[in-house]
Amino acid sequence: MSRQGAFFSGWLVVLSLSAFPAFAQTAAPNHTGFPKLVTGGGVVRFGKPLVVDLDNNGGPKEIVVGACVNSNTSNPACEDRRLYVFDNAGNVRLGWPQSLPAEPYSSPAAADLDGDGVLEIVIGVGDAVPGEGNGEVLAFHASGGPPMWTFPVPGSPNGVASTPALGDLDGDGKDDVVFGSFNSNVYALKGTTGLPLPGWPIFVRDTVWSSPALADLAGDGKLEVIIGADSHLEGAPVDTKSGGALWVFRANGSNFPGFPQFAPTSPEIVGFQSSPAVGDIDGDGCPEIVIGTGQSSSAAGKLLHAWHRDGTLVAGWPVTLGGHAASSPALGNLDTDAALEVVITDDTAFLYAFKGNGSQIFKVKPKSAGGADAVVIGEPTIAQIGANNPAILVGGVGFDVTILSKTGTPISDDGTHGGKLTYTTGHPVAGAAVADLDGNGNLQVIAASGSSAGSEADLGVYVWNAGVAGALPWPQFHQNSRRRGAVPVTGGGCALPNPPLHFFTLSPCRVADSRQSANLTYGGPAYTPGEQRVITFTGVCGIPATARAISINVTITNATVPGDLRIFPGGDGSPGTSAINWRAGQTRSNNTIVPLSYEGRGHLTVQADLPGGQVDVIVDVNGYFQ
């Protein structure tokens, strides 16, 4: 299950720090109303600040943070948990804070879930401790007050460290909510109700720390869900290989072609606890997926991967890091070509930048305000301050937020390399954001942590003025306020190829017959109302693993009541049309062509829809497509 290693690496970002803050020689210019120090307000330990225009009217932006109140630093448990919303002048917005039922390990996200034109805030809570049973996802209206809806996550442990990603999966024009849980499931909830969408949740066999990315990989205008998970033999119930898995699902919950992909096997626990980033890193006009591994002390646990959307590795990847990469990569154009570069931190406090071919641009250890090497650094973000200045990187360095140029050298907010400006807070920083809070064309750097080093009782929200606004390729955790983790590909022409399939005839071969209880893998008893049975065709009757669809003759007989039969790819949802219909007492046959599942296992699902009674089903295969 790899929870111990996962829990430790999660704490590294914000808690495994011994250095206390040292103030920069040149004071950073505070934005009016900041820093905002809230006595008894708690500290932001794991989440990153959300910067968003909640009113969705083009006006000033708000800052949203989840905080843990803990007056006893020797006990990591929170005494109180709160969700805050601050305006651009540092005032707590009317209707806030709101109480949370457990600690917010995840970061808040925002989108218009109900279609009223104003955004809602979504956050996940709960930890990895078995028996706690405190995992939950909550949605709040921008005005505050009681939650719009809550979704208690079943099982134990059931915490949600996975930051929810918001996007329209069911095609109704409103965003839905996607996240993973420590209960080994990935969920997609209807944005308006908080109830699971058809085809979800999906069991991914081990704990999920990774935050999902949402991106159109197929080029068909629909979002796919991309997420990492732990994957280890210890205690796993089914079909698990040691190494960690990168999963990609279609909006209906079925597997996307070419996935899951697994990390290299290792005698130790590996796992994808990094949150994937999606964008065009090789300049081919199509999105790639970038994600890091974590936990294992072997080389397999210190890799940064990049996959094409068909599941093949991008040339030059994976690359080896000096430590585990549990953070999310950030993507941005650091040079003049069309491809995005990749920036990531590891748990040895190094910051890396790579080109799309895997070549390293730099590897640096940022320094604190006092000039000491960083011990631990948080999530990177990428922005451009000033029309003529290079893209810069902003990362949490202990108590500080530091700025580096595209070559990894320190840089001040005016673009000079001599200033080496570092912003200092009163507590460890998990990550920063860059935004134009006021809408006046000037950027601010935003961080949230605590107000003093020795206390976890007092909240500190910090905002510094940082110069004229430029491009913002990756300005906050997981790229945007919906936390989709993707830089959209523009220009089109990226639909997945659909090569012609060739048909191969087979002598009729019986695969399933519910009248028999012996001699066939898929025998009796008869089907009962609503029953689904999964049939594997790969390796049966000469069907190869490369088959994409099959031609089958389906016969029903001994029907005691009228009904219909539905046949569909394994992993897909049940279709609205039937393959065959019948009346009581009839025997009927029909030939149909059905795609096989994209899971690489050649599955079909047979579902009997009848109001009562039973029916026998016979399946004969007579050909396949590949």
Q: What name fits each language-model region?
A:
Residues 1-7:
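N-terminal secretory signal peptides that target proteins for export/translocation
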Residues 9-21:
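Bacterial N-terminal signal peptides
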